[in-house]
A protein has these predicted regions:
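Nucleotidyltransferase catalytic core that binds NTPs
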Residues: 1-160
Length: 160
């Protein structure tokens, strides 16, 4: 059985994230979405809210997908969960450069492998930052996030 971890802050999770999870399910037996607490970042949603939103998004995918929050180093979480493979979505060359540095360090420090996936074309333009910006002006989120995430964003920004 091949299990992978798909880590991130996911603040908020969007359809590009869901695309990577769905496609990972086609390739691997088990996908663990690991949501980082990330206390050094300013976050719109707390860890519990982000875990909740991601769980709702992946519910139709069934038991192949688990969503868990974690605090600390990803490699420590992976060791605890018995995971050795990281899946990362890479949209642009600048993403790849940053992700490659992290992947090389993870490999050297903990012997874990990283697999890079390009998002599907219809999601390549989506980022959590863009979603937050649009939501902060009560703009339309259709085609960017799951309806449940859109509801949570509207509530957070007091949108009608």
């Amino acid at each position: 059985m091949i299990s992978v971890v798909y880590p991130g802050t996911f603040d908020p999770p969007h359809l590009g994230h869901l695309d990577i999870v769905k496609r990972s399910c086609e390739l691997f037996d088990r996908v663990v979405v690991a949501i980082a607490k990330s206390p050094r970042k300013y976050l719109l949603f707390n860890l519990e809210e982000r875990v909740d939103m991601f769980r709702v998004m992946v519910e139709p995918l069934g038991p192949k997908v688990e969503v868990k929050g974690f605090d600390g180093l990803l490699v420590d979480f992976m060791r605890k969960e018995g995971l050795r493979i990281i899946v990362r979505g890479v949209r642009l060359f600048t993403d790849f450069e940053y992700e490659l540095q992290i992947a090389l360090n993870n490999s050297k420090l903990a012997g874990v492998e990283t697999i890079f996936m390009m998002p599907s074309q219809e999601y390549i333009h989506i980022s959590s930052t863009i979603v937050r910006d649009i939501a902060s002006y009560c703009g339309t989120l259709e085609g960017l996030v799951h309806p449940y995430v859109a509801k949570k964003l509207r509530e957070k920004f007091h949108c009608p």
